[in-house]
Amino acid sequence: MFLRSVSSITKPFRRIESPKQLARRMAVLPDTYADPVRIAVIGGTGLRELPGFTQVASLNIQTPWGTPSSPITILHHTHKDKTVAVAFLSRHGLHHQIAPHEVPARANIAALRSIGVRTIIAFSAVGSLQEEIKPRDFVVPDQVIDRTKGIRPFTFFEGGVVGHVPFGDPFDESVAKIVRACGHSLEGEGVKLHDRGTLICMEGPQFSTRAESKLYRSWGGSVINMSCLPEAKLAREAEIAYQMICMSTDYDCWHESTEDVTVEMVMGNMKANAVNAKHFVTAVLDELADDRNAELVQAKQYAGSVKFGLSTAQANWSPEARERMNWLFPGYFEIDLYIRYLLLIQRDIDLTSWN
């Protein structure tokens, strides 16, 4: 927490795990995991400690796009006498040291795909842009408006290969239905859920001006955060089903009868609602892990979509682009003999040019 109220000084001291202590604890875990992991959670570090889940591995994966924002923690959970594996990644680092515009989203998504992930549940604190979405309410967004500024790398398809994937529906409706059902099942236990909404993703790290906040309301925006993009776009490019769960922590700065958003306000509501958030995410993971959803979490509806979205013929890919694409989609692109022949000719030309 960046800000602290004076009253918090009088509260009992709670020991916080230091970076060295956390690193030491995670170092004890195995650094490999053999089986594919289909489901992942991206969120804050608090969600790594889910009730009923046991940490069994901590993976440090290097990608062509760099290092992910945290090690990927593999969690085991028993559901209906079956052990289910779930991957967890801390979006802003293990100690929330990575700013929204610094999150290595490409490395995060690529690393998750490399261990078999095909469905991502993303969790985020958001500001509410509508009166009916109160602080501590949950929202399952179905649309997003991109207000980032191009500072964040936002595509896998560049530097020698061009691709365009559909993004009309940025979230996966099949996964969203499960999330909504789980949320409504917990409404008697403190969870208040809004089934749909338009998410505004802003650049940050500063909060909105009052004029911006009112503008987003006039556009029909429901909630606002700094985390959804390019995460959701990259997941689509990687053929991964993606659904975000939003937890409202404030009314941004448009509301005339409440205080403007502060970090202290955000963190306070997140802490107060932490139990509900964990129960919600746990319920979703339990449902996704059920045998009847085994096909759904493999996101087969997206399989092969990249092949149809690429505009650059394989023969014309740069060597660097080919290496990146084969890392992200191993065995995915078959190179026929004619293309191999062209590549060999090109290689020979390049070699003779040095003589």
Curated annotation (Swiss-Prot):
UniProt name for this protein: S-methyl-5'-thioadenosine phosphorylase
NCBIfam families (UniProt xref): MTAP
Site (Important for substrate specificity): S208, V263
Origin species: Emericella nidulans (strain FGSC A4 / ATCC 38163 / CBS 112.46 / NRRL 194 / M139)
Biological processes, Gene Ontology terms: glutamate biosynthetic process; L-methionine salvage from methylthioadenosine; purine ribonucleoside salvage
Pathway(s): Amino-acid biosynthesis; L-methionine biosynthesis via salvage pathway; S-methyl-5-thio-alpha-D-ribose 1-phosphate from S-methyl-5'-thioadenosine (phosphorylase route): step 1/1
GO cellular component: cytosol; extracellular region; nucleus
Annotated transmembrane regions: none
Binding site for phosphate: T45, R91, H92, S124, A125, S227
EC number: 2.4.2.28
Intracellular or extracellular location(s): Cytoplasm; Nucleus
Recorded superkingdom: Eukaryota
Listed PROSITE patterns: PNP_MTAP_2
GO MF: mRNA binding; S-methyl-5-thioadenosine phosphorylase activity
Protein keywords: Cytoplasm, Glycosyltransferase, Nucleus, Purine salvage, Transferase
